[in-house]
Amino acid sequence: IDLSKISDFNYAPKDKSISHSQVLFKDYNGDNVILIIKEMCDVLTKRLRAMNKCTKVISFGIGYSRSVGGGFYHSFKRDVPTSDTKEICNDCLRIFDKYYEDLPIRKVSIALGGLSDDTGMQLNLFESIEEKVHNKSKDKVVDSIKDKFGANSIIKASSLLPDSTAIERNKKIGGHSAWSLWN
């Protein structure tokens, strides 16, 4: 028996990542789960920007309902790291469109890996510089409002739709009810 303390080992992971997954309260189809994917991308990219990091690897997974079982989990490696909500969401939706089999969905998972410091913006000839700068500024403003006034202080209109989980999820801590904090 090895009686060594775990704290005696200096272990540093080679690659850090952040992730978010959600078990849904009901079965979702391919159309209404897109709202959940976008909401989860908003949450993850806010965390990414708060860490002042960019991601190069986007992993996305779907768990189907128990009635059918199974699911998929795939990764996409970007050429250029990003912290842009729209770009990361589009990557997730690309994976979803490629692998989704039109079955009832009960779980959505997203992970962002290959993290690096956010040192600037990589530009190319095929993208509008103005749009990239605008998106980055918009994301920072929305993040600062949410930090100052709470996650539900500024929401997208789509978060008011019946299939949205964002407002209720924002009232939870680690997926558990934070009732005493809100009442």
Residue ranges and their predicted role:
Residues I1-P104:
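DNA-contacting surface of Y-family translesion DNA polymerases
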Residues R78-N183:
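Acidic, metal-coordinating catalytic segment for phosphate/diphosphate chemistry
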